[in-house]
């Protein structure tokens, strides 16, 4: 029994040391309120080639693995246009917030994509993802304009946008870094 405890502690110490030495992806995020809308800009660099980066941002259904995204499913795909239904659930300072949206993505292989809400709870939601090769890594660059249509007080929404969005992008960057270790078969 004592050997099992010592072995388990050794494994836990090894895991903690490995996690400590894992390079942390730096994520830059800015959120600015402009009138009734929010402008969001974010970027992060991941040790992943451009093909795998594009496969990552176009894996729409994998978005369910990001905290706050309850559902994400492809409704249709035609050429470079993809329609995705997405449901996000958050609690913002004790206010439950659920946002349903249908997005149209226009893919530009290995360069990025544009997206726009075509139906949903937001008054406006549109933006872009751009991929910038940097050596053996790729920089993910996101920009969007969001005007939320909600009963949640505006000050609470502003708090959410400025304090929670960064965590969401950090989770995306961590997921991309994890996926970088298991390349997409389409890119082999």
Question: Which residues make up each language-model segment?
Answer:
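Hydrophobic pocket/interface hotspot
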Residues: 52-54, 63, 105, 131, ...
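Short, well-ordered alpha-helical segments
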Residues: 52-61, 160-168, 172
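Positively charged n-region of N-terminal signal peptides that target proteins for export
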Residues: 1-4
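Hydrophobic h-region of N-terminal signal peptides that target proteins for export
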Residues: 10-17
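Hydrophobic ligand-binding cavity/cleft-lining segments
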Residues: 18-81, 139
């Amino acid at each position: 029994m004592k050997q099992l405890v010592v072995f388990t502690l050794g494994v836990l110490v090894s895991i903690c040391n490995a996690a400590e030495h894992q390079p942390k992806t730096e994520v830059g995020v800015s959120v600015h309120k402009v009138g009734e809308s929010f402008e969001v800009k974010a970027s992060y660099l991941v040790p992943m080639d451009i093909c795998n980066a594009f496969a990552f941002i176009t894996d729409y259904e994998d978005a369910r693995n990001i905290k706050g995204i309850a559902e994400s499913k492809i409704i249709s795909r035609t050429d470079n246009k993809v329609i995705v239904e997405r449901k996000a659930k958050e609690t913002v300072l004790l206010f439950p917030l659920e946002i349903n949206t249908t997005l149209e993505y226009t893919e530009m292989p290995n360069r990025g994509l544009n997206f726009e809400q075509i139906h949903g709870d937001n008054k406006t939601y549109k933006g872009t993802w751009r991929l910038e090769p940097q050596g053996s890594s790729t920089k993910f660059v996101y920009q969007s304009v969001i005007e939320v249509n909600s009963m949640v007080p505006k000050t609470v929404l502003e708090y959410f946008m400025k304090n929670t969005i960064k965590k969401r992008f950090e989770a995306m960057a961590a997921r991309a870094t994890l996926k970088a270790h298991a390349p997409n078969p389409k890119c082999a």
